């Protein structure tokens, strides 16, 4: 008997996304679609979007962690573009990676050149035993 007369109900397994199979939060399917539509190559392998999504997720997590630390240092509970800028520019590798990137509303790193800083005075007594003859520039 071929069993054509019996109605066998096959329960289809619940669809599992490629992101969940890879243990990622970033969408593997969307990355795959963007790779195909972007005219980067004629064909895109099955592992390429998984790898790219994992790399993007890692970089995002790294930047967000550093930006969260910058926000906490400034006693803020919300990350703003300034915190992203501080996070990226204070990290050597991220700064090299994102060297040509401008972050809108990010500002600049506080930096004063060493030659512009005031000279350190030597306690007021010179080597000859007399008091230093430096006068203030206030008139």
UniProtKB/Swiss-Prot annotation:
Cross-link (Glycyl lysine isopeptide (Lys-Gly) (interchain with G-Cter in ubiquitin)): 14, 16, 120
Chain residue ranges for the region called Disordered: 1-21, 119-139
Molecular-function GO term, any one: protein heterodimerization activity
Modified residues annotated as Phosphotyrosine in this record: 139
Phosphoserine PTM sites in chain numbering: 2, 136
PTM annotation: Phosphorylated. Phosphorylation of Ser-136 (H2AX139ph) occurs in response to DNA double strand breaks (DSBs) generated by exogenous genotoxic agents, by stalled replication forks and by meiotic recombination events. Phosphorylation is dependent on the DNA damage checkpoint kinases ATR and ATM, spreads on either side of a detected DSB site and may mark the surrounding chromatin for recruitment of proteins required for DNA damage signaling and repair. Widespread phosphorylation may also serve to amplify the damage signal or aid repair of persistent lesions.
Location, primary (coarse class): nucleus
Signal sequence range: none
Membrane-crossing segments per the record: none
Modified residues (N6-lactoyllysine): 10
Domain of life: Eukaryota
Record keywords, A-Z: Acetylation, Cell cycle, Chromosome, DNA damage, DNA recombination, DNA repair, DNA-binding, Isopeptide bond, Meiosis, Nucleosome core, Nucleus, Phosphoprotein, Ubl conjugation
InterPro entries listed in its UniProt record: Histone-fold (IPR009072), Histone_H2A (IPR002119), Histone_H2A/H2B/H3 (IPR007125), Histone_H2A_C (IPR032454), Histone_H2A_CS (IPR032458)
One cellular-component annotation, GO: chromosome
Gene3D superfamilies: Histone, subunit A
Subcellular location per the Swiss-Prot or TrEMBL entry: Nucleus; Chromosome
Modified-residue entries (N-acetylserine), positions: 2
Motif residue range(s): [ST]-Q motif: 136-137
GO BP, sorted A to Z: DNA recombination; DNA repair; heterochromatin formation; meiotic cell cycle
Function text: Variant histone H2A which replaces conventional H2A in a subset of nucleosomes. Nucleosomes wrap and compact DNA into chromatin, limiting DNA accessibility to the cellular machineries which require DNA as a template. Histones thereby play a central role in transcription regulation, DNA repair, DNA replication and chromosomal stability. DNA accessibility is regulated via a complex set of post-translational modifications of histones, also called histone code, and nucleosome remodeling.
Similarity field: Belongs to the histone H2A family.
Free-text note regarding domains: The [ST]-Q motif constitutes a recognition sequence for kinases from the PI3/PI4-kinase family.
Subunit record text: The nucleosome is a histone octamer containing two molecules each of H2A, H2B, H3 and H4 assembled in one H3-H4 heterotetramer and two H2A-H2B heterodimers. The octamer wraps approximately 147 bp of DNA. Interacts with numerous proteins required for DNA damage signaling and repair when phosphorylated on Ser-136.
Record's protein name: Histone H2AX
């Amino acid at each position: 008997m071929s069993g054509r007369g019996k109605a066998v109900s096959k329960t289809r397994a619940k669809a599992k996304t490629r992101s969940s199979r890879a243990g990622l939060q970033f969408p593997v399917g969307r990355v795959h679609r963007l790779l195909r539509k972007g005219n980067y190559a004629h064909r895109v392998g099955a592992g390429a979007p998984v790898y790219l999504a994992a790399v993007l997720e890692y970089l995002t997590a790294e930047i967000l962690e550093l930006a969260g630390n910058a926000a906490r240092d400034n006693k803020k509970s919300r990350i703003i573009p300034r915190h992203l800028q501080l996070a990226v520019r204070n990290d050597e590798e991220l700064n090299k990676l994102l060297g040509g990137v401008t972050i809108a509303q990010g500002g600049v790193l506080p930096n004063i050149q060493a030659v512009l800083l005031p000279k350190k005075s030597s306690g007021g007594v010179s080597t000859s035993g007399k008091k230093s003859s430096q006068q203030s520039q206030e008139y």
